[in-house]
Amino acid sequence: MTGASRRSARGRIKSSSLSPGSDEGSAYPPSIRRGKGKELVSIGAFKTNLKILVGLIILGIIVIYFVINRLVRHGLLFDESQKPRVITPFPAPKVMDLSMFQGEHKESLYWGTYRPHVYFGVRARTPLSLVAGLMWLGVKDEMYVMRHFCENSDDLSTFGWREHNGRDYGRQELVENDMVIETSFVKSKGDGLGYGGDWAVRIDVKNKGLNDDVKRSAHLFFYLADEGGNVLNLGQDGLDFQGSSLLVSGSREDVGDWQIHLKSQNQLETHYSGFKTPHIYNLSDLVQQNLALQARKFGRLQLSDTSEDSSNIYIFQISGRLPFTIDIPFISGIKGESSNVEKRLTSLTGLPLSDLLKKKHQEFDAKFNECFKLSEKHDSETLGVGRTAIANMLGGIGYFYGQSKIYVPKSTQPGSRDNFLLYWPAELYTAVPSRPFFPRGFLWDEGFHQLLIWRWDIRITLDIVGHWLDLLNIDGWIPREQILGAEALSKVPEEFVVQYPSNGNPPTLFLVIRDLIDAIRMEKFVASEKDEVLSFLERASVRLDAWFQWFNTSQKGKEIGSYFWHGRDNTTTQELNPKTLSSGLDDYPRASHPSEDERHVDLRCWMYLAADCMHSITELLGKEDKLSKENYNSTVKLLSNFNLLNQMHYDSDYGAYFDFGNHTEKVKLIWKEVIQENGQLSRQLVRKTFGKPKLKLVPHLGYVSFFPFMSRIIPPDSPILEKQLDLISNRSILWSDYGLVSLAKTSSMYMKRNTEHDAPYWRGPIWMNMNYMILSSLYHYSIVDGPYREKSKAIYTELRSNLIRNVVRNYYETGYIWEQYDQVKGTGKGTRLFTGWSALTLLIMSEDYPIF
């Protein structure tokens, strides 16, 4: 229900009116109304009150029953001995309770641009935060439209962070039609400030072209909302930019008394509206309804300049002719005159703010050059894309709080209509794949994200990985997609919210942890960083062990050393090839008929990586548990056994590695008339099998086939390595001028739709994460001794050049880094601003690869 309808409902709660000329006491004789006959009145009142009391008791019992029933269904009213295992936290000290994540570190990261789903937003790393954000009126098809949440459908020419250091500074550009909005965020710390310090936002709005003769106007909406429901106090009804600049003030336990100001040297018109609501995910609806009401009443496109009692949200409309600039400083920890409010305001507005932003810009450039050392290798355009990649990766980091929904069969919850339990309330600090489309945490993406982030800021990486590991349940399982909080839930269809505890996801966090271990061995860290990584591993090792054991037991296959991704649907008639969502490769073709006989070569290699990583941790930490160390060592030996790998997955005719399972190539989607539940006749695409499946290698060459190559299990002198190099470089199979395609052009599933509505996803398009991993192994084989060293180097050099050139070209043609790239033309596809693993382009530029 929208805010306007909530207010209307509240307005309808009035005392019952009486009919004209009626008197409330007219049912009684005058003598009784004057106080005579008190006994009659008392008895009548007693009977009435008794009925009401009984009714209230019955109603209360009913309410309590339903509340308790719901709490039990959602796992909120179990004692620890009765709580279902799936929603029971892992019984070990939390990683995030380490001292390294407290004190100055925690405070330094308290405030940030941790709302990746909106075009610009600020919040604190606390469940019920003070939240700030920006909206504006855009124009589409000659109509005003509200811009707030990042949406692909908004079709902005470009948007994203141009600079961001992940801690206290960021500069973003948003371009819509002929208008450019630049948002800058910077933090200030010092003695006497509130927890987390002060911060400021600068918003520059200008014409895209140099022609200032076209004086168009812009309407911005800057808002403050307190998720905890704390009352906000309006500074003044009308803003005088030359005088008082106070927008709104308030008080919170975390930061004390605070104020938000707005200052500008331009002629601007301002209006406001205040709301009282527990929800902030529908703020744009509140604004649009308020504007629409004002337009109908007065013909003006402006907020109402009114506020509800005890408002916890204030929205300020700032309108003016382009160009204009506004500065919005946040001052906290105010304690009387000693707080130097005016001095702090001066330091975060006007020229002092310009100087601070310039300093942060210079620091960003210096750190970028120090971390990636690209200046002598690439032209300015390529360097620009590299800066955009790291800036958007860091600027896309978000903070979320809520409870995941975990699937449980209804049969385990008698009388329940729900098929889920609620995970425990948890917070998550994480990078996200894409602000417009995937603005939340994804487990298998995060390992790739951290390969880039740790090279910029190791402490941010440890903080993020620690948050993920603290989501581990008692069985060693982590939900693969984190949809936490009302704002996140509002962006995801209900059918995709529930997480399945039998399903895994590639354990890519081992990828970055292994990288950190190798960095220690290669002495890439200063002493303090090394100590923190070791402390982190000491605390995290028990959780990593439990995570590994969950995979090693729940995803194991029938044969020793075999594994398969659980969760494939063996009953579906709607899919050409049942998806394997848990693998992260969704529609990549596997065995046509899912069964427990399957062996998935990619999961086998992930398990090799995980076991090798755990073995390295036990060695690095000098663990005394020899049994655990030997178990990991034996698992590493088993999974790196080249002969066993070949027996299970190698096809000597193709010279390639494949999955194994119950498979036939004779399947296709055909149109069939189907009677719906409502009796209507419709046509649907359904799968038809024309041949009996049998157990065999699944002949679909693609990314999955190269996991043994990516894992570097293949000896550098093996002829099988040459086979892999030939397959990679064959233009008729995987090679393109833009990168390696995800599925061989010779595959029967190449670019085939999986359902009527599912376009090919991992069946041809070029993906940067897999190209990065293959490229890293090409680099490896090009520097180790072996007969295929030069061949590896030649392929590596050309593939690297193709990948960089295509990403850079697309960025300057479209304004974005993309989720995937077309297998024929190289054009960007999928969601835009996909600066999750597509940002690995920067590591390709710097030739910085993990030791898989």
From Swiss-Prot:
Glycans are attached at residues 282, 552, 570, 633, 662, 730. The chain crosses the membrane at residues 52-72. The active site is at residues 586, 819. Residues 1-31, 574-593 are annotated as: Disordered. Residues 73-852 are lumenal. Residues 574-583 have a biased composition (Polar residues). A motif (Endoplasmic reticulum targeting) lies at residues 6-12. Residues 1-51 are cytoplasmic. Residues 91-150 are annotated as: Required for endoplasmic reticulum targeting. It is found in: Endoplasmic reticulum membrane. Residues 15-26 have a biased composition (Low complexity). Belongs to the glycosyl hydrolase 63 family. This is Mannosyl-oligosaccharide glucosidase GCS1.
